[in-house]
Design a protein with these regions (language model features):
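C-terminal nucleotide
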Residues: 2-11, 36-73, 84, 166-354, ...
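DPxDG-like acidic metal-binding loop motif
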Residues: 30-33, 108-128, 365
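Short Gly/aromatic-enriched secondary-structure transition segments
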Residues: 23-30, 208-209
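Glycine/threonine-rich beta-strand-loop-alpha-helix active-site module
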Residues: 125-172, 176
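Phosphate-handling active-site elements
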Residues: 84-95, 122-138, 370-383
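Hydrophobic alpha-helical hairpins/lids featuring a short glycine-rich hinge
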Residues: 61-91, 95-102
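Conserved phosphate/anionic-ligand binding catalytic regions in large, soluble enzymes, centered on
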Residues: 20, 112, 151-159, 354-363
Length: 391
């Protein structure tokens, strides 16, 4: 009986975040923390799932994965879709053993790490290896179709193809990977857990996503220009649009009467809900611009412009954080943390901070000098926030 394993890291969302679904450039960093999935063949034709802190689950073959507990849907969904895509079936039963150091509900892609690790194990077990970015795309399908979370492809790409110690530029149209970009020597980006749990399947994220696609459709209708991605526009182009073309907000019913639906299969427009469409579509356009500037700064950094470049880079993080709040993905705890970092300032080795991933809690990304870590620990204790920083 064969026994194989797959392993994949969580990721730190440096810039980009929820702009991925609008075709933005994002900058992602793999973590040291990983998830390992061990799959063992058994003679009994059944599926068994074990995970630390969860009750074991056993299913006969053919059970719909959507009938399983939510935590099981991630690995089972990967198996279900892998079997269909690769036309492969195990010879007997399978036992899945999951262990992970990636914290859950903290915005560092514990789900993507689990999906990618599962698919890597299945590659070994079946002898069928994915080419290109197919593994990441199948992992995203498991989360979208089986788990029911409307995430973009960013997390899975970062977990599958990121390089340790560097930022991976990903142009989410849908999966163009750039060359990794390193931070200057002595400077680190880390995750500071807020202690506030979040989930991509929750309403604020879904509302922001739907609002972005509604905004895109309104722009297309008002300008008579077809857009594949909203981020094909520049921030100045969006700002120049009139209230008539791109209103500040409108209800789902008014939008449907004006435009019908959106071209995003993962978004549902609720007729009675009011959507802040201008902010929702402006954020990814501006975030794409921030990510482009960040890559340019990091690739051109030198001893003579180091501090100035880091100061501008930090301001991009602060702008991104404010953008999250504008689309309903902020929270008081992360606002307090970011302002705490800002108060310490560049003179003490703190360049910038932002809420990351899906927002609404989770993890704050901090850009700082490595020597400033003790000061961040003191700030965390002062604010009564966690000190278990994520690297």
């Amino acid at each position: 009986m064969a026994k194989v394993f797959g392993e994949a890291p969580g990721r730190l969302d440096f810039l980009g975040g929820v702009a991925d679904y609008s075709g933005s450039l994002v900058l992602e960093m793999p973590l040291r923390l990983t998830t390992r999935v061990t799959i063992t063949e058994t003679r009994i034709p059944e599926l068994v799932f074990h995970s630390e802190g969860q009750e074991s689950c056993t299913f006969p073959f053919g059970t719909d994965p959507q009938d399983a507990p939510k935590w099981v849907r991630y690995p089972y969904g990967c198996l279900w879709l892998f079997s269909a895509a690769q036309r492969w079936k195990p010879k007997g039963g399978l036992k899945f053993q999951i262990s992970s150091s990636v914290p859950e509900s903290m915005g560092v892609s514990s789900s993507a790490a689990l999906e990618v690790a599962t698919l890597r194990a299945l590659e070994k077990l079946s002898g069928q290896v994915f080419t290109g970015t197919k593994l990441a795309k199948l992992a995203q399908r498991a989360e979208n179709e089986i788990v029911g979370a409307p995430c973009g492809l960013m997390d899975q790409l970062a977990s599958a193809y990121g390089v340790r110690g560097a930022l991976l530029p990903i142009l989410c149209r849908p999966d163009r990977l750039g060359d990794p970009v390193k931070l200057p020597k002595g400077v680190i980006a880390l995750g500071w857990p807020s202690g506030v749990k979040h989930a991509v399947s929750d309403s604020p994220y879904a509302t922001a996503r739907a609002g972005a696609f509604m905004g895109k459709k309104l722009i297309e209708k008002g300008t008579k220009r077809k857009l594949t991605h909203a981020t094909e526009l520049s921030p100045s182009q969006v700002r120049s649009l009139s209230e008539e073309v791109l209103p500040t907000s409108l209800t789902g019913r008014v939008f449907q009467n004006r435009c019908g639906g959106v071209d995003d299969p993962l978004s549902t427009i609720e007729a009675s809900r009011r959507y802040d469409v201008r902010a929702a579509v402006s954020f990814p356009v501006e975030e794409n611009n921030r990510s482009e500037i960040a890559v340019s700064l990091l690739r051109g950094i030198s001893k003579t412009n180091r501090q100035d470049s880091l100061k501008v880079l930090g301001e991009l993080l602060y702008q991104s954080h404010a953008g999250y709040s504008s689309i309903g993905l902020g929270c008081p705890e992360t606002d307090q943390m970011v302002e705490g970092v800002r108060s310490l300032g560049v003179s003490k080795g703190f360049y910038g901070a932002r809420v990351s991933g899906g927002g609404s809690g989770g993890t704050v990304v901090v850009l700082l000098d490595k020597t400033s870590l003790p000061a961040l620990t003191r700030l965390a204790r002062k604010l009564k926030r966690p000190t278990n920083f994520i690297l």
